[in-house]
Amino acid sequence: NLKANYQIKKIKYNFDSTVFNLRYKNKNKRIKNITNINVKLLGKHNVLNAAAASIVCINLGADIKIIKKSLKNYTGVQRRMTKVFSKNKNDFYDDYAHHPTEISSILDGVRKVNSKRKIISVFEPHRYSRIMSLTDKFSKCFSKSNLVIICPLYPAGEKKNFKFNLLRFSNLISKNSRTQVIIVKNEADLGKYLKKNLISDEIIIGMGAGIISKWIAGLKYSLWF
């Protein structure tokens, strides 16, 4: 929006960071530009968060240099594209993403700086109610993945809903995101599949709000990896 008081400009996605400019009008209605704001985070949603934080600080009268330095030093919270380990040039990440918008944003950011690497999404569906109400959006948010590995649904206290079918859900993702999808039964099954099929220089991202974080971390030490 060219009429907006604050505008994000020239977003550049790097391997481990994102850089952008922020254009705004000061109290005297003069155009100001903050260039090369660097955040050690990926994804458009993190650019929006960093811009929002900058705007608050600007309106509170904070020094621009301090704003930029603070954002550059901020490494984010745990489970937001947290690198867990690397093995055979394969990089394993863990992310809390469990909503279609989050998933799409993460994968879009990763793909922009890794155009040739294979991206494997290990997705743990979270809550029957969420998956069933957003099935269509979930089915379309994995288009930047070369492979989606679907784990058992984590109910988070909800009673089992027999109307939900994991195979049908997986087939919809394959169809609408136009990508390969497989289902694993448990943690051991995931480890065995990756051990057999991983080659090199691939990116594996665990996504979900249940126990997927433990599964990804466990791959480093498991007997079947």
Where are the regions that the model predicts?
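Beta-strand->loop->alpha-helix junctions that form or flank phosphate-binding loops
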Residues: 1-14, 38-44, 68-72, 184-185
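Generic structural signal for residues in well-ordered beta-strands
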Residues: 20, 37, 92-95, 181, ...
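Short amphipathic alpha-helical segments
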Residues: 105, 133-135, 161-162, 195, ...
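C-terminal helical cap/extension that packs against the catalytic core
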Residues: 139-200
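A glycine-rich beta-strand to alpha-helix segment
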Residues: 189-220
